[in-house]
């Protein structure tokens, strides 16, 4: 063993064959808002800049070839002004039709398959939240489902979902590839629901688009279009801080733990925490859409 830390600078080797345990320690000299925060830029490009002495976003010049989104990120950081493309946002909103659902799924991934027609680490949906608005000014309604931790949750999940989305209207999600993939997996395993699921998929619209395409971008988003960054940037008064469960990974682990849990009080408490978390996800989408609709 060595008594001194080797004098090796950070580089691509920090990630190979996996992320080094000293990753954060060795990056203490990297400032906030650095080139490593740039969205959609290859790691090799970032380290190429780093080796040339370019570390802060302030040091990135126009001559450096970068993707459009990264250039927007740098420009917003440098001039301190939010980017809001009103025409692009207006066009996006014209493609969304009321009545409108806001939908979010939660899944868990058992390493050892627990159910027929499943595979190791398959994402098994066990919960959804739906907010519903008949029109822009109508009161918000809420529907939800959380499976009992007894047996395969997929059939009760899809049956309740199809029932709860039976009104006409678009279905808004955040990052539609996740929900659509889960729905297609259910239709493959349970083909009796295939036609209904295909119709449901045809109604899905993606709220991620204005942020992914940088129609709306602020420095607080740190180059990300994840809802966990977009929400505090657009609706700072709304956050997950007060919730016992504040991210999807913990929701998965919490639900999976219920299969072994015998204490009814613990079960009820954890179920309530799961319901509150998933409800917050779709309520966040409601508030984000309201913010976009308020742009004149």
Which residues does each PLM region occupy?
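An acidic- and aromatic-residue-enriched active-site/binding cleft used to recognize and process polar
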Residues: 25, 105-108, 135, 176-178, ...
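Acidic, Mg2+-coordinating catalytic module of metal-dependent nucleases/exonucleases
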Residues: 1-35, 43, 52, 222, ...
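Conserved RNase H-like, two-metal-ion catalytic cores of nucleic-acid enzymes
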Residues: 88-167
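Conserved DEDDh/DEDDy metal-dependent 3′-5′ exonuclease domain
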Residues: 1, 142-252
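Generic, well-ordered alpha-helical scaffold segments in large soluble proteins
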Residues: 49-52, 63, 77, 96-99, ...
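N-terminal accessory regions of nucleic-acid-interacting proteins
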Residues: 38-100
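Short helix/loop capping segments that flank catalytic or ligand/cofactor-binding pockets
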Residues: 29-30, 47, 58-59, 110-113
């Amino acid at each position: 063993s060595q008594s001194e830390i080797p004098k090796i600078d950070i580089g691509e080797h920090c990630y190979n064959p996996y992320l080094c345990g000293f990753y954060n320690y060795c990056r203490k000299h990297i400032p906030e808002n650095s080139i490593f925060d740039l969205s959609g830029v290859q790691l090799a490009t970032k380290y190429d800049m780093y080796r040339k002495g370019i570390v802060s976003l302030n040091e990135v010049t126009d001559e450096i070839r970068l993707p459009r989104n990264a250039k927007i990120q740098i420009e917003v950081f440098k001039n301190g002004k939010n980017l809001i493309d009103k025409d692009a946002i207006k066009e996006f909103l014209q493609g969304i039709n009321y009545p409108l659902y806001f939908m979010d799924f939660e899944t868990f991934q058992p390493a050892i398959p627990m159910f027929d027609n499943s595979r190791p680490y398959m994402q098994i949906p066990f919960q959804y939240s739906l907010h519903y608005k008949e029109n822009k000014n109508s009161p918000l309604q809420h529907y939800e489902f959380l499976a009992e931790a007894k047996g395969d949750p997929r059939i009760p999940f899809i049956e309740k979902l199809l029932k709860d989305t039976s009104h006409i209207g678009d279905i808004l999600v955040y990052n539609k590839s996740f929900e659509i993939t889960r729905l297609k997996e259910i239709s493959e395993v349970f083909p009796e629901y295939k036609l209904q699921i295909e119709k449901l998929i045809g109604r899905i619209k993606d709220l991620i688009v204005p942020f992914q395409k940088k129609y709306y971008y602020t420095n607080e988003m740190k180059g990300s279009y994840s809802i966990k960054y977009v929400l505090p940037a657009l609706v700072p008064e709304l956050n997950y801080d007060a919730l016992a469960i504040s991210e999807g990974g913990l929701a998965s682990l919490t639900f999976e733990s219920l299969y072994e849990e015998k204490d009814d009080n613990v079960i009820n408490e954890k179920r309530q925490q799961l319901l509150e978390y998933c409800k917050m996800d779709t309520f966040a989408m409601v508030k984000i859409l309201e913010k976009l609709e308020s742009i004149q």
